[in-house]
Amino acid sequence: SDPWKAFQGLAGKTIVLTINSKPEKTGSRDILIKPEDGEQTLRYRAWIENNRKKVDAATNGKVGYIYVPSTGIDGQTDLYMQFMGQLEKEALIIDERFNSGGQIPDRFIELLNRKLYNYWARNGFEDWHTPFIGHFGPKVMLINGWSGSGGDAFPAYFKAAGLGKLVGKRTWGGLVGISGAPGLIDGGYVTAPSFGYRELNGELGIEGYGVDPDFDVENYPHELAKGNDQQLNKAIDLMLEALKNNPPKKPGKVKYPDKSK
């Protein structure tokens, strides 16, 4: 019989699953799970984790990897969660390939672009810095032709802020937006373009064109099928080179004055 038949209609619902190392009730235990309706989310998370492990192994733990799927709520959540977990990395690879957009990502750039003001010292403790949440090492961003809307703005702002180089392929080039969506009697709605991106000089700029990479790197399907991500490899090489040419510097221990004299 089909072992998955009992799970039909239960996707997204919390259920009790009885498990054991052998097919009998004795010694079994109950666990709570929420079944998925497909493998896409699991494969997506596995892809991110595999990329992170690859970067970690290739750089001896010096470089972090952050994937940003959108500039909407899920993208904000993923960026902040992964950023907080890798603050102590000496360099960061920001991967926004396939970024589906959402909101305008100015706050994303503010998080990545925080400047170091000072350190604080205390006897017997490690120094800490202001701002407390910030990464001050080199960065690089991965882009491709499936990144659009907010996924165009993110690398454009990243480059404008001087945060680092862009690696991959030119982005989609779609920053005309909509505002308001009149509802229809059948439950549908109507949208129409109502505003668009302009450069500081008044030109359309990346609208209809996209954001060019600094390093144009193609990812061929037959190489990806073998686990060979040339774009990610290039980003790793750039970060290792940046750390070699400009290793991170921290202040020495404070020499406290002798106030007894």
Model-derived regions: residue spans:
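Metal-dependent DNA phosphodiester-chemistry modules and their immediately adjacent helices/loops
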Residues: 53-54, 147-149, 184-216
